[in-house]
């Protein structure tokens, strides 16, 4: 019986000529004349046992592929050009991709030009980016590859500080490519992380590129109001899904989001004031009643900072209150702050550089009803007066942007909405062009390069250019609350001495 001789790494395999001539694969068609010669056909880059497995497949149309031998069989199948075995191997590898091997499979797919495996391994890296940073192969990704991964809209990061830690870990292994840090969007990075990056001698350029990482964009919590029961839903820009979280039977409440929990504060139930605070976890949808506030009140102002929920002012029956207090997330004790200089309800409060600013609202007693324009700032454990707003406003929405405060006013006694900018360092107010008029509730939050306003439609206001964009949407009887990530960077005064400890803590929190 005539045979064709193959030599692999010095080992000889004799193959029946009939198997070679019956093969439909191009590689064997090209060597069918070699059986007349005595010399062996040398095969380079192929494993001996993998070639045996391919011969078994040619004989019996069966092959034993496992996670342990799949790579060597796949390499042999690619070189020998046996498409059915290539497909079987690729399916096996894709089925077994996980966060511990996805970078190795990613590199393998590039080396041999396997598009399906490339796409599958890239998807696994994108979905498990924080976990794969522990892989020794992570630092060997090229600058362009990591840029592509971190620029993908579905990359699984939920805070730009997490992106920063991923980049810092990669830069540690690739110190000649520090300019990759410029894929960060500074507006989404906390001051603490910015300081740490600066102490490392790195400079982040102001980004002019659009934000592609959906996970760092603001999630939205929506409360659709009715006369009795309001429905709470949560929208994730990353998944593009709306999820019903639960319901509340309160009116005249305030709400805010802290550590992925929505807090419903005060208000009225069946026309009775309440001092209870409810909290719903937006991931598990579980409700919990937290410690009561110091008094019964509705129409309070709230803001969050450094893991704490601040509740300021409000209406105690028919009298405005100046009580200010805060609750640290996960604790059960309210801490009182000094009272406001002027009691008020329905005002706005916002943090700028760890100072609280409170503005507008209504001061009322049994005899008085005064719409306010005054502004107070809580700094160094006391309230101080600041320059008043240009006009008196009972409904005020405020947001911090680039170290200053932007205020949009509602309509009650006023004839139209106003837009103001408060320059914090100069203690100065200026009036800006207001694009629309809307009677009813609004939502305002800072979203990177613009301020989002939801009223009768969705508006984007760009402070740097003083321009507006308009998007139609149905917003009747809906309130919107900003959603913050639970992965908050440890807040501290980062110095050269404390920098290693800070980065170590962030790595443990974000990347493990």
Swiss-Prot record:
InterPro entries: BACK, BTB/POZ_dom, Kelch-typ_b-propeller, Kelch_1, SKP1/BTB/POZ_sf
Keyword annotations of the record: Kelch repeat, Repeat
Annotated signal peptide: none
Kelch repeat copies, ranges: 216-261, 262-307, 309-354, 356-403, 405-449, 452-498
UniProt xrefs under SUPFAM superfamilies: Kelch motif (SSF117281), POZ domain (SSF54695)
Taxonomic superkingdom: Viruses
Domain BTB: 2-67
Keyword Repeat: yes
Ranges of residues in domain BACK: 102-176
Keyword presence, Repeat: yes
Alphabetized PANTHER family for the sequence: KELCH PROTEIN, KELCH-LIKE PROTEIN 8
Family affiliation: Belongs to the poxviruses Kelch family.
Protein name, as recorded: Kelch repeat protein C2
Organism expressing this protein natively: Rabbitpox virus (strain Utrecht)
């Amino acid at each position: 019986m005539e045979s064709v001789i193959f030599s692999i790494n010095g080992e000889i395999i004799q193959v029946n000529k009939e198997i070679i001539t019956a093969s439909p694969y191009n590689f064997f068609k090209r060597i069918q004349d070699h059986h007349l010669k005595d010399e062996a056909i040398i095969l380079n880059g192929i494993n001996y046992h993998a070639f045996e497995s391919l011969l078994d497949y040619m004989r019996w149309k069966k092959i034993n592929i496992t996670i342990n031998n799949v790579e060597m069989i796949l390499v042999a199948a690619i070189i020998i050009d046996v498409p059915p075995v290539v497909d079987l191997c690729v399916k096996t590898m894709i089925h077994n991709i996980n966060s511990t091997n996805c970078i190795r499979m990613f590199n393998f797919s590039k080396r041999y030009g396997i598009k399906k495996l490339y796409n599958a391994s890239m998807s696994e890296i994108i979905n498990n980016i924080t976990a794969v940073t522990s892989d020794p192969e992570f630092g060997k990704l090229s600058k362009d590859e990591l840029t592509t991964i971190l620029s993908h809209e579905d990359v699984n990061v939920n805070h730009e500080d997490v992106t920063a830690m991923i980049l810092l870990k990669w830069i540690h292994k690739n110190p000649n490519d520090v300019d990759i840090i410029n894929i960060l969007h500074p507006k989404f990075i906390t001051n603490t992380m910015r300081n740490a990056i600066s102490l490392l001698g790195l400079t982040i350029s102001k980004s002019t590129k659009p934000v592609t990482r959906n996970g760092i964009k603001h999630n939205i919590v929506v409360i659709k109001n009715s006369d009795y029961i309001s429905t709470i839903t949560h929208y994730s820009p990353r998944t593009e899904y709306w999820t019903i979280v639960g319901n509340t039977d309160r009116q005249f409440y305030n709400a805010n989001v802290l550590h992925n929990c929505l807090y419903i504060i005060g208000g009225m139930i069946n026309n009775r004031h309440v001092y209870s605070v409810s909290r719903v976890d937006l991931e598990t949808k579980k409700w919990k009643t937290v410690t009561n506030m110091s008094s019964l009140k509705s129409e309070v102002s709230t803001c969050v900072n450094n893991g704490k929920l601040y509740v300021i002012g409000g209406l105690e029956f028919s009298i405005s209150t100046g009580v200010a207090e805060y609750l640290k997330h996960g604790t059960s004790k309210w801490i009182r702050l000094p009272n406001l200089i002027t009691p008020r309800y329905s005002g706005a409060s916002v943090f700028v550089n760890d100072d609280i600013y409170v503005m507008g609202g209504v001061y009322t007693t049994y005899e008085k009803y005064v719409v306010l324009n005054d502004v107070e700032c809580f700094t160094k454990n006391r309230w101080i007066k600041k320059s008043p707003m240009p006009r008196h406003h009972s409904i005020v929405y405020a947001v911090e942007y680039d170290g200053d405060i932007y205020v949009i006013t509602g309509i009650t006694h006023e004839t139209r909405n106003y837009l103001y900018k408060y320059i914090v360092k100069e203690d100065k107010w200026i009036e800006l062009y207001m694009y629309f008029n809307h009677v009813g509730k609004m939502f305002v939050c800072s979203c990177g390069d613009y301020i989002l306003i939801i009223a009768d439609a969705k508006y984007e206001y760009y402070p740097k250019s003083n321009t507006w964009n308009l998007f139609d949407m149905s917003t009747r009887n809906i309130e919107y609350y900003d959603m913050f990530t639970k992965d908050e960077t440890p807040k501290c005064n980062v110095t050269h001495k404390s920098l290693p400890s800070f980065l170590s803590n962030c790595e443990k929190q974000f990347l493990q």
